[in-house]
């Protein structure tokens, strides 16, 4: 995977090197890395800002740095192979986002940080970040019964598919 230009590039995205066949493997690898990092953080049980929030933000940043350039190229290149590669990632990203948002252990870890002595020493921005993350857990259905979580996941995937189809249709119409 080290030859994939979407993974761990130093500064600006290497747009000229990005090919459609790089997109899905990069996203799959980075989602797997994100899942592994979440499990590692939870297993370590050290729920302070550096070990919880910053660690997971770094993984999210890696995923965003990979998928962001792919999304940009998809929007401007009007290349069917790239569009297919981009679209093939959407269900995985939707599933991963919902999975993270509904992770009760992760939500509890953030709540532990919120209730800790460290809370008062965090900056206003850091506190707001944690509060927003706790809100996002609730909005993602972390407290729903399992059957409702599954329905939420299915709805999220379907919304992702429809949004992508709408964008594809817009691009197709613009090129007419």
Annotate each language-model stretch with its function.
Residues 1-175:
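Zn2+-dependent metallopeptidase catalytic domains
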